[in-house]
Amino acid sequence: MGLGNSKPQHKKQLSLWHALHKTRATRYGLLADPLIGQSSTLQEECDKALKESLIRKRNGKMTPEGRKLQEGDKWDEWSDEEDEVGFPVRPRVPLRQMTYKLAVDFSHFLKEKGGLDGIYYSDRRNQILNLYALNEWGIIDDWNAWSEGPGIRYPRCFGFCFKLVPVDLHEEAETCERHCLVHPAQVREDPDGINHGEVLVWKFDPMLAVQYDPNRKYLTDMHDLGKRK
């Protein structure tokens, strides 16, 4: 009886085996030429970055509290934050002075990207703006200066289409958790270093690119600005 039952089962296995071998083999095509180039380039960059990270000499001695400097080490030769993601810390383009056309182009770029208009002013954000202009556009950071307060702060660089406008916070905003502690709305920092008790926001004003009055206090000669610094 066992023999009789095993024959149908054996036939089923043979039929399944034949069915599998009759199935068409799947053909895999090659990547398009542009994709091949991108893939190889990315692979080369990853291999290079990995190799540099493995052979790079690190100063200091690792301890449970972190890496500590030893005798002869310099502070700027290493950083525990070097693997963090962010924009480049060194200029990627040749350095250049701010010009009228460059200031207008830079202003409209910031406006289109929505990265500055309506944002609370703070010293830290102003420094980030300087770093971005320096590293991505190659603009030397002697352009970012403002008229004295209180009131609206106008850019001293003719062509830069952003001004700092004081705003009044309503009661809900002042008590909101998002505006507590070190939030720029509560810190009330001022570009001239004097606390006028005002909350400032960047405001885009395209008329700053066409209205030039040398007699107004907020527009100064760039040579005089450079001498003061």
Curated annotation (Swiss-Prot):
| Ranges where the record places region Mediates dimerization | 127-143
Instruction: Name the domain of life this protein comes from.
Output: Viruses
Membrane protein topology class? Lipid-anchor
Is Acyltransferase given among the entry's keywords? no
Q: Which Pfam families match?
A: F-protein
Per UniProt, subcellular location reads as: Host cell membrane
Q: Any transmembrane segments, and where?
A: none
Q: What is its main location?
A: host cell
For this UniProt record, give its keywords in alphabetical order, as a comma-separated list.
Host cell membrane, Host membrane, Host-virus interaction, Lipoprotein, Membrane, Myristate, Viral immunoevasion, Virulence
Lipid anchor positions (N-myristoyl glycine): 2
Give the start-end ranges of region Acidic.
Answer: 76-84
Return one GO MF term.
Answer: GTP binding
Gene3D superfamilies reported for this sequence: Nef Regulatory Factor
The entry's cellular-component GO terms read: host cell plasma membrane; membrane
Also noted in the record is:
This is an African green monkey isolate.
Self-association state and partner proteins as the record states? Homodimer. Interacts with host CD247/TCRZ; this interaction induces down-regulation of cell surface TCR/CD3 complexes.
Q: What does this protein do?
A: Seems to play a role in optimizing the host cell environment for viral replication without causing cell death by apoptosis. Enhances virus infectivity and pathogenicity. Probably involved in viral immune evasion mechanisms.
The UniProt family comment states:
Belongs to the lentivirus primate group Nef protein family.
* Domain remarks in the Swiss-Prot or TrEMBL record: The N-terminal domain is composed of the N-myristoyl glycine and of a cluster of positively charged amino acids. It is required for inner plasma membrane targeting of Nef.
Protein name as it appears in the record: Protein Nef
UniProt lists the gene as nef
